[in-house]
């Protein structure tokens, strides 16, 4: 018996290019694993704590794992409790970029849940992630933050677990294929394409198709996508052109310092900050009248991370790479790094870039509270602000704000908003969808109102695309019924099958690819091990060889007789081989040794042989044995009518029983043709008997005993027993009698060589499929 451990998996809808496809017809109804389920547990109709779980064919993938910038502690996390039962089975966590709203919950998820899967990021993302979150842990320790989500050991554990990938690199894990593409947005940002059972899902993360000062725009994956999970931060808004945006930004800053004010630019330490530093440094170089105005950048973290920017200059655009050949564009001439507010001379005009970007806490909040009541000062908000944050609140220009110490103070400084957030706008999003043409689009990472407007616009523009906007912890289910395709390999395709042929082989499934192989090819095409179980059984048998062979030939068709030497004395024992698979060695008057290689079919045949031999041994008189004396007939001759007549006469003369001399058992080697003739006569007798039982009495032809006449209510038919054919003018009667004869033949004839009667029952070893000639 061939044992193989089948790899678990399912068929994909993709087509392989090979000579032969074998397709199993789909059953009616939808199976559970045909449903692809997408559940945002963060970023569903909101911006912040991006985290999306995808489930399909038993595989589970999580995209991003961030915190919400408007909250702190456990309430800032994605809704992990809503997927608690799924967490131990999540295969992959794919993190798109280093921003906290996409990555800051990773240490918590890896260290404090039952997650056991693999984590992937690009090289720059991992480098900056480590620095950003080390800083987060230090700040939490200094402020003795009770809401601290994780500590240094959790972060270290996550860094050990994170694996790095490059753009366009293909990774495969547990039947899931992963490829990442450049997403623009920030250094190292990636879109992730995953493929499960031929269904392709693209998660964009935050992306921008517009090239800026240092980054290339997002690329369009060159493959057909089935589901697109895409950000919708800016909804239907359209960004102003880059040069206009830069001009408005530098003008806003210039106006503040020109009136001797202090200009605060709240930014996140990394990402857009580097873009803004490039713009300001270039503007200051071009405007000597501003050289006396210092630009401060208060971030030791950013200074540390600039090393990463220099390392991965090759992942930036041509402009930066060309400039890098001359000098490092990230070594600024007019920008001073300072550690904090203590070493800062707060006199005269200045430009101050400080984090965080939404003024929730930290240095940017301290400076804002210090400067907000002086009308000479100004703030330029350069990125997207989330609902519930101070940055979002002051954009509506309230008369006063509440400081962190709960004191209300007037808001007199000027508030400007210039978007540098490097998110996709409506034009970029719709162009991207137009190029990819996905049947399904799932919107995430957007304010509920913006997302709703974007959905309406996309539905109007792309009438055939299904656009979905799930809320947090709510799932969308999409049905994919992939074509079930198996590829034939090895010796099984030596003779290519025709339509409706039966293919016998072993179906080996691994990671949604399927192959049908001959058992003998298993070790050539897989790493599976096969074993053959050899069976040997001894049965007591005191009857004659003639009884044995005659009985077997009535049941089994392909029989070869030979002799086999056993022991050292040169004794030769009669041997019978059935279907080239099963060997019977006859020990005269003592026993039969049965040998075979175990498999489903051979075991079944051997069961029947054992039953047959046991019956002969218990009651030899119950076995109808044919006359053995036909050695005078030439083996090559056809069986004639005269042969049949002679056989019938000899049967009448034949006396029951064996030779009188019981002391000496004679082995009679009986001619193959004579036994064949005897079996044919038996078949004719059975056919005649059973036809008479079914249709009543037949009249035997006067001149030929092998012709029967049937006559009932003027319905006439002639049956030729020798050829088992029927003549009749009544086609219905003719067909009816022919069908009866076929059924009788099937029941009384030996089992055929091809064993179809048995094999068709053997569903595990047979795969009946239609042949696909695509």
From Swiss-Prot:
Enzyme class label: hydrolase
Active site feature: 423
Gene Ontology CC annotation, any one: mRNA cleavage and polyadenylation specificity factor complex
Residues given in the record as Zn(2+) 1 binding sites: 97, 99, 185, 206
Ranges annotated as biased composition (Basic and acidic residues): 638-655
GO biological process entries: co-transcriptional RNA 3'-end processing, cleavage and polyadenylation pathway; mRNA 3'-end processing by stem-loop binding and cleavage
Annotated residues for binding of Zn(2+) 2: 101-102, 206, 445
InterPro entries: Beta_Casp (IPR022712), CPSF73-100_C (IPR021718), MBL (IPR050698), Metallo-B-lactamas (IPR001279), RibonucZ/Hydroxyglut_hydro (IPR036866), RMMBL (IPR011108)
One Pfam family in the UniProt entry: CPSF73-100_C
SMART domains per the UniProt record, alphabetical: Beta-Casp (SM01027), CPSF73-100_C (SM01098), Lactamase_B (SM00849)
Cleaved signal peptide residues: none
Origin: domain of life: Eukaryota
GO molecular function: 5'-3' RNA exonuclease activity; metal ion binding; mRNA 3'-UTR AU-rich region binding; RNA binding; RNA endonuclease activity
Cofactor(s) required for function per UniProt: Zn(2+)
Gene3D superfamilies to which the protein is assigned, alphabetical: 3.40.50.10890, Ribonuclease Z/Hydroxyacylglutathione hydrolase-like (3.60.15.10)
Cofactor comment: Binds 2 Zn(2+) ions per subunit.
Basic residues composition-biased segments: 1-26
Stretches for region Disordered: 1-30, 636-665
Subunit details: Component of the cleavage and polyadenylation specificity factor (CPSF) complex.
Protein task: Component of the cleavage and polyadenylation specificity factor (CPSF) complex that play a key role in pre-mRNA 3'-end formation, recognizing the AAUAAA signal sequence and interacting with poly(A) polymerase and other factors to bring about cleavage and poly(A) addition. Has endonuclease activity, and functions as an mRNA 3'-end-processing endonuclease.
Similarity-based family: Belongs to the metallo-beta-lactamase superfamily. RNA-metabolizing metallo-beta-lactamase-like family. CPSF3 subfamily.
Protein name per its UniProtKB record: Cleavage and polyadenylation specificity factor subunit 3
Protein's gene: cpsf3
């Amino acid at each position: 018996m061939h044992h193989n451990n089948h790899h678990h998996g399912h068929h994909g809808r993709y087509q392989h290019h090979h000579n032969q496809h074998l397709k199993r017809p789909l059953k009616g109804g939808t199976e559970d694993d045909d449903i692809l389920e997408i559940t945002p547990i963060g970023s569903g109709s909101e911006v912040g704590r991006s985290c999306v779980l995808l489930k399909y064919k038993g595989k589970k993938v999580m995209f991003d794992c961030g915190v919400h910038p408007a909250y702190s502690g456990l309430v800032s996390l994605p809704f992990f409790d809503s997927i608690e039962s799924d967490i131990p089975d999540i295969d992959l966590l794919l993190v798109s970029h280093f921003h906290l709203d996409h990555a800051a919950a990773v240490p918590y998820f890896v260290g404090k849940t039952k997650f056991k899967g693999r984590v992937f990021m690009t090289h720059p993302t991992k480098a900056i992630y480590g620095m950003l979150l080390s800083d987060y842990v230090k700040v939490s320790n200094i402020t003795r933050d009770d809401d601290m989500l994780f500590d240094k050991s959790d972060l270290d554990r996550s860094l050990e677990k994170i694996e790095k990938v490059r753009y366009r690199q293909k990774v495969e894990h547990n039947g899931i294929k992963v490829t990442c593409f450049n997403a623009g947005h920030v250094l190292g940002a990636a879109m992730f394409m995953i493929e499960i059972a031929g269904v392709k899902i693209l998660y964009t993360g935050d992306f921008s198709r517009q090239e800026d000062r240092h980054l290339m725009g997002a690329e369009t994956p060159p493959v057909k996508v089935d589901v697109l999970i895409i950000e919708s931060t800016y909804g239907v808004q359209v960004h102003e052109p880059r040069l206009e945006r830069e001009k408005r930004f530098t003008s806003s800053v210039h106006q503040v310092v020109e009136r001797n004010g202090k200009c605060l630019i709240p930014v996140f330490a990394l990402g857009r900050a580097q873009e803004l530093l490039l713009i300001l440094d270039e503007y200051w170089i071009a405007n000597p009248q501003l050289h006396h105005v210092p630009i401060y950048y208060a971030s030791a973290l950013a200074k540390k991370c600039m090393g990463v920017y220099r390392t991965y200059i090759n992942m930036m655009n041509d402009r930066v790479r060309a400039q890098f050949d001359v000098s490092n564009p990230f070594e600024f001439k007019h920008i001073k790094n300072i550690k904090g507010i203590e070493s800062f001379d707060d006199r005269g005009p200045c430009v101050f870039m400080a984090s965080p970007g939404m003024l929730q806490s930290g240095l940017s909040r301290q400076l804002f509270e210090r400067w907000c009541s002086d009308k000479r000062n100004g703030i330029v908000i350069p990125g997207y602000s989330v609902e519930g944050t101070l940055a979002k609140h002051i954009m509506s220009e309230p008369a006063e704000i509440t400081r962190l110490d709960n004191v209300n103070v007037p808001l007199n400084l000027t508030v400007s908003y210039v978007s540098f957030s490097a998110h996709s706008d409506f034009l970029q999003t719709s162009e991207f969808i137009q190029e990819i043409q996905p049947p399904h689009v799932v919107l995430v990472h957007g304010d509920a109102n913006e997302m709703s407007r974007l959905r309406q616009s996309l539905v109007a523009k792309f009438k055939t695309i299904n656009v979905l906007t799930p809320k947090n912890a709510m799932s969308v289910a999409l049905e994919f019924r992939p074509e079930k395709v198996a590829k034939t390999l090895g010796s099984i395709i030596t003779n290519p099958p025709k339509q409706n042929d039966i293919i016998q082989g072993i179906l080996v499934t691994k990671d949604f690819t399927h192959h049908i192989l001959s058992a003998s090819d298993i070790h050539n095409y897989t790493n599976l091990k096969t074993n053959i179980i050899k069976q040997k059984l001894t049965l007591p048998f005191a009857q004659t060889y003639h009884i044995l062979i005659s009985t077997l030939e009535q049941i089994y068709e392909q029989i070869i007789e030979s002799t086999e030497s056993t022991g050292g004395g040169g004794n030769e024992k009669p041997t019978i081989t059935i279907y080239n698979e099963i060997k019977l060695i006859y020990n005269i008057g003592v026993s039969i040794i049965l040998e075979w290689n175990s498999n489903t079919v051979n075991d079944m045949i051997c069961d029947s042989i054992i039953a047959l031999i046991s019956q002969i041994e218990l009651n030899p008189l119950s076995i109808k044995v044919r006359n053995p004396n036909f050695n005078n007939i030439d083996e090559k001759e056809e069986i004639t009518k005269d042969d049949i007549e002679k056989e019938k006469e000899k049967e009448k003369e034949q006396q029951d029983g064996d030779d009188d001399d019981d002391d000496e058992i004679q082995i009679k080697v009986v001619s193959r043709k004579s036994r064949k003739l005897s079996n044919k006569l038996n078949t004719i007798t059975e056919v005649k008997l059973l036809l008479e039982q079914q249709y009543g009495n037949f009249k035997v032809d006067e001149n030929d005993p092998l012709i029967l006449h049937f006559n009932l209510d003027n319905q006439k038919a002639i049956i030729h027993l020798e050829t088992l054919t029927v003549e009749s003018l009544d086609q219905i009667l003719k067909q009816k009698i022919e069908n009866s004869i076929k059924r009788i033949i099937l029941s009384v004839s030996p089992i055929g060589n091809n064993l179809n009667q048995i094999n068709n029952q053997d569903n595990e070893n047979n795969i009946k499929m239609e042949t696909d000639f695509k």
